[in-house]
């Protein structure tokens, strides 16, 4: 893939004395692994650009799973994330690295990612709404289609005052028992609209995305989530 395309660095680590190994999310090629030769050398003009949350244009090529970065240009300065929004951005980056297959195109998700990072950079309050919207978008692009507005058992429209239990691969069914896998009809409407007007709907959205993402993450915990827990007291 030798043409220019938009991209963000998800993660980087030293590779040999002068190079970097990059995990990069691109608009056209999805997630790719690139070697940036000489990027760590003192004369390299790439070091400052190859940072997370910096909008890039990149060219790369080669055979095999690991490609070679040919060129990279920063489109703008890095989006300003700090404190809780920085940890949130690192979480989003790790989530993409963990669940997306290599070199599978997710052009629409790329823009969902961009909008999420922009929302985090401009957040004046909690980053949670932006995170929940991105998680729901990610699940949708992975083929995790859930009908939030209809009962899987009867097909009836959900009622705001009723409780529904989530069943993986089936959807939501009416339930009289309330536990971690149950949601009110009001919660389900918020999930469908990706709008969370209060803490109650935000907490419900977080519960749902944790349940839905678990099969993709396996048993290995997210490092960024642990950092986030240390930075933000449990609510």
UniProtKB/Swiss-Prot annotation:
Disulfide bonds: none annotated. GO terms for biological process: DNA recombination; double-strand break repair. Keywords: DNA damage, DNA recombination, DNA repair. SUPFAM superfamilies: ArfGap/RecO-like zinc finger (SSF57863), Nucleic acid-binding proteins (SSF50249). Pfam families: RecO_C, RecO_N. One of its GO terms (cellular component) is bacterial nucleoid. InterPro entries: ARFGAP/RecO, DNA_rep/recomb_RecO_N, NA-bd_OB-fold, RecO, RecO_C. NCBIfam families: reco. Involved in DNA repair and RecF pathway recombination. Belongs to the RecO family. This is DNA repair protein RecO. It comes from Enterobacter sp. (strain 638). The lineage of its organism: Bacteria, Pseudomonadati, Pseudomonadota, Gammaproteobacteria, Enterobacterales.
């Amino acid at each position: 893939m030798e043409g220019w395309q938009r991209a963000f660095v998800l993660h980087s680590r030293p590779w040999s004395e002068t190079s970097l190994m990059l995990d990069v999310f691109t608009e056209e090629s999805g997630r790719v692994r690139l070697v940036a030769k000489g990027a760590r050398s003192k004369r390299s003009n790439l070091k400052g650009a190859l940072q997370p949350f910096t909008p890039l244009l990149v060219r790369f090529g080669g055979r095999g799973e690991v490609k070679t970065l040919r060129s990279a240009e920063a489109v703008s300065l890095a989006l300003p994330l700090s404190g809780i929004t920085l940890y949130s951005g690192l979480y989003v980056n790790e989530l993409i690295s963990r669940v997306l297959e290599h070199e599978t195109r997710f052009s629409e998700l790329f823009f969902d990612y961009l909008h999420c990072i922009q929302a985090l950079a401009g957040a004046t309050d909690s980053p949670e709404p932006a995170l929940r919207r991105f998680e729901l978008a990610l699940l949708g692009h992975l083929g995790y289609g859930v009908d939030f507005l209809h009962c899987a058992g009867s097909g009836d429209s959900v009622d705001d005052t009723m409780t529904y239990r989530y069943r993986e691969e089936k959807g939501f069914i009416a339930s009289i028992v309330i536990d971690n896998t149950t949601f009110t009809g009001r919660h389900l409407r918020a999930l469908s609209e990706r709008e969370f007007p209060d803490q109650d709907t935000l907490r419900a959205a977080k519960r749902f995305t944790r349940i839905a993402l678990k099969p993709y993450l396996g048993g290995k915990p997210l490092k960024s989530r642990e950092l986030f827990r240390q930075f933000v007291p449990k609510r």
